[in-house]
Amino acid sequence: MYGVSPLLLKAVAQVESNMRPHVVNSTHTANTQSQDIGLMQINTRWLRRNLIKSLGYTEAHLYDPCTSVKLGAWVLANNFTRHGASWEAVGAYNAACTRLKGDACRRARNGYAWKVYRAMRKSS
């Protein structure tokens, strides 16, 4: 989907929600006014983006596993466009680095990418 490997999507879902489609992460709501929802833990900030908004997606859609994977693939594809086909792009799925900068951003992205890599190795 969007040119993103199904194995990568499965690994991200494993890391993000442990394959549970109804998980909600509200730990950063106070700081970001957003939540991560569903199988791929799509951040509700994505719903404010013009393309996603124009497609009519709402918070309720994020609980649907198929929609969650579709939007997760879209986010990853956009990351690959911005960062190249790299583990940094995978890390950016979880660490957008709007607040983290420099080495702190790189550490967060590398740590997340490593988790996804290990999940991919386990499932293959």
What feature does the model see in each segment?
Residues 1-124:
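Catalytic glycan-binding domains that act on GlcNAc-containing polysaccharides
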